[in-house]
């Protein structure tokens, strides 16, 4: 609750964080550009969307026309999230890609997640990463092109309406965390050095 207070979010209000990498993701920004005008301030949650440096200006301009009251409706649009630890601590639900660093952090923090794996990666590794989280019960996986803004919003609302489901997802994510990853990696490096 302290992280929410620092972000100006009232106690008890839920926060959804939508983040798609530092450059952003064109398809997901298109979906979010359609979704944000659907929020009327009565949706029961706040949304923080990071558009990425490549897409921020165009998205801000478009939403200035289609959702001029978005701030009053609980929506914050950012180019980039510079205070990521605070924002992720405050998040009740995260929407993102499935890169290894991202999902490692989400597991460590125990954050329920809606994952849209990038289709533009080698050997489809993001979907493979996402399916591990899904199988454990920590993530809902959506594939690009198989959903739209309306169905994504419905998924968000459904998850946020079920506190027990969010708790179970959080526990599932935490169960996958490798809290000693640094020590294990260093151990492997040292073992390799000593063998040579």
Model-found features: residue ranges?
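Short, amphipathic alpha-helical "lid/cap" segments that border enzyme active or binding sites
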Residues: 33, 149-153, 182-190
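A ubiquitous structural signal for well-ordered alpha-helices
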Residues: 35, 62, 155, 169-172, ...
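C-terminal alpha-helical cap of glycosyltransferases
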Residues: 158, 178-196
């Amino acid at each position: 609750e302290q992280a929410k207070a620092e972000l100006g979010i009232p106690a008890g209000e839920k926060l959804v964080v939508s983040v798609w990498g530092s450059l952003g993701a064109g398809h997901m920004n298109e979906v979010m550009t359609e979704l944000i005008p659907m929020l009327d301030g009565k949706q029961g949650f706040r949304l923080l969307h990071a558009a990425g440096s490549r897409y921020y200006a165009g998205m801000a301009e478009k939403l200035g026309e289609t959702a001029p009251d978005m701030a009053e409706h609980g929506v914050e649009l950012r180019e980039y999230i510079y205070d990521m630890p605070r924002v992720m601590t405050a998040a009740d639900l995260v929407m993102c890609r499935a890169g290894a660093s991202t999902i490692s952090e989400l597991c460590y923090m125990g954050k329920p997640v809606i994952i849209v794996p990038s289709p533009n990666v080698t050997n489809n590794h993001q979907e493979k990463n996402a399916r591990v989280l899904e199988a454990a019960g920590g993530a809902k996986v959506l594939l690009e092109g198989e959903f739209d803004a309306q169905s994504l919003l419905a998924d968000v609302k459904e998850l946020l309406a079920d506190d027990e489901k969010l708790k179970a997802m959080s526990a599932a994510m935490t169960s996958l965390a490798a809290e000693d990853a640094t020590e294990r990696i260093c151990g492997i490096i040292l073992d390799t050095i000593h063998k040579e």
